[in-house]
Amino acid sequence: MRVVLDTCILKLATFPAGNNASALIFELARTGLIEAWVSPAILEEYADVLGDHPELVAEIVESFSVCYPLTELSVIRHEPDNRFLECLAASAEFIVTVNTAPGHFDRKHYQAVSVARPGEFLNVPGVGRLVKKLLRG
C-alpha cells in the first residue's frame, strides 16, 4: 500500500503519547509495512518542521521512497499542500492528513488517491492486519 504522509502526521507522531494513530502510521511506514513516498520538496518541509527531531528526519530519509514529480500542481488553495499531490506520480493510494479543512485537503479524493485522516486510514481494509503485525514485533 503506497501512501503520502502530510507533515502534520509526522509532527503528531512525535508527541509523548506514542500510541496515537499518527505514531502507528509512522511506524508502519518506517518499518516498511506500508510504502511511504516523498518528493525532495516534501523532504525539505519535513526537515523544516521536524528540525528538533533530526533522528526522525534521518529515519524518513532512510525508509521512505522518493519520487520526482514531473509537473507542478496548483489545485489546493494552501500552496504547500500541492507538493503532496505532486507525489501522485508514485501511484500513491492515500494521502494521510489531519488537514481536511477548506483550502487544504478538503476533498475525499484527488484523481484515484483517497484522502484519509489517521483514524480513517487505520480502518482501511488490510491496515488493521498490518498494525497487529507491527505490534507483535
For each predicted feature, which ranges?
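Short secondary-structure boundary segments
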Residues: 7, 40, 98-100
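Conserved N-terminal substructure of TIR/SEFIR domains
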Residues: 11-12
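Extended, non-globular alpha-helical segments
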Residues: 43-58, 126-136
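Active-site neighborhoods of divalent-metal-dependent phosphate/nucleic-acid chemistry enzymes
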Residues: 65-108
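Acidic, PIN/NYN-like endoribonuclease modules and their adjacent C-terminal/linker elements
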Residues: 78, 82, 101-137
